[in-house]
Amino acid sequence: MERLIYIEKIKIDDKTVLGLKVELPDSPPLLLMVGEKGFIMCGYLNVEVAERLQVTAAMVSGVKSFQDILEAEIKAATSKARELGINLGMKGREALRKLA
């Protein structure tokens, strides 16, 4: 199977975030959307480690596309993300506005 990595610029209002999608064998893709202040990750990545590293990050789950991330609810967030106003249950699009 050919594995592919996709990188895409995505507009959120007047800002741009970077989307990274890695196709994986026999599983959903690994997804990440990165803004200037932090990032949203899919459930493959570990929020507890992000917290220990003191980064600004939030996590969504059950996503297969960038559009899914925008529509998904935040399931976990580091303390630095919460300081920016990113709360559990917030939509990914709203969180990215704060991270862009």
Residue positions per predicted region:
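Residues that scaffold, gate, or flank divalent-cation-dependent active/transport sites
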Residues: 2-100
